[in-house]
């Protein structure tokens, strides 16, 4: 029983990895079961259907795997940052660094978000996470007063746009680091308290 369970889990992981790589290469719309099966070296699409109820089920597994990979890369850096401002900066900078470390995962997630974001509560939850982060920072007196939803939307859309460009052009790590600093500077300044101590 343990051997069969291990084999089944291994096969699922193999299919998910292949699906992520196919989505990164040809896009979500063209990522058919036949393409994924061929990429995974499977004899038929029936192997995929055995492990997943359909494309939506496979997509959910792909998003979960990508989020695990990205979380393992980014979260320790964010947790090590001291305070709301530093965490904001680290989130942005590590997002750009992620492009260099896991390009296929980033490209796949971008395409999934663009085509099927409604199917991933975790992806959609980014907005709520940033809203809460900004509220907490305002309550702590480190962010100026602003509409947290508007700024969260601006952050996510702006960051995603830069990440999309970086994922397409595959710049060197030093360039990714520069892009991360530039974008982080922009958002830190946009949310910072007025130099005179009042609100902007």
Predicted regions and their residues:
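Amphipathic alpha-helical segments used for helix-helix packing
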Residues: 87, 96-118, 164-167
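Short coil/turn segments at alpha/beta junctions that flank glycine-rich nucleotide-binding fingerprints
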Residues: 25-29, 81, 102, 140
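Short, hydrophobic secondary-structure boundary micro-motifs
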Residues: 107-110, 146, 198-200
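Helix-turn-helix
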Residues: 14, 22, 26-57, 61
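C-terminal peripheral helix-coil segments that are non-catalytic and often amphipathic
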Residues: 2, 97, 128-139, 158, ...
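Amphipathic alpha-helical packing segments from all-alpha helical-bundle domains
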Residues: 68-75, 116-140, 149-153, 164, ...
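Hydrophobic alpha-helical connector segments
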Residues: 75-104, 151-155, 180
């Amino acid at each position: 029983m343990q051997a069969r369970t291990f084999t089944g889990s291994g096969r699922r992981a193999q299919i998910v990895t292949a699906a992520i790589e196919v989505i990164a290469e040809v896009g979500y719309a063209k990522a058919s079961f036949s393409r994924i099966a061929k990429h995974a070296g499977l004899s038929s699409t029936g192997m995929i259907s055995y492990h997943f109820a359909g494309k939506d089920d496979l997509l959910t597994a792909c998003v979960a795997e990508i989020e695990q990979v990205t979380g393992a890369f980014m979260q320790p850096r964010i947790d090590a940052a001291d305070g709301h401002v530093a965490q904001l900066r680290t989130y942005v900078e590590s997002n750009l660094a992620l492009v260099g470390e896991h390009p296929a995962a980033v490209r796949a997630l971008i395409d999934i978000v663009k085509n099927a974001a409604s199917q991933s509560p975790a992806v959609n939850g980014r907005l709520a996470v940033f809203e809460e982060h900004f509220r907490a920072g305002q309550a702590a007196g480190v962010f100026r007063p602003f509409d947290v939803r508007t700024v969260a939307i601006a952050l996510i859309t702006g960051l995603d746009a830069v990440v999309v460009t970086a994922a397409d052009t595959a710049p060197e790590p030093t360039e990714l680091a520069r892009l991360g600093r530039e974008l982080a500077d922009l958002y830190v300044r946009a949310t910072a308290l007025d130099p005179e101590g009042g609100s902007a």
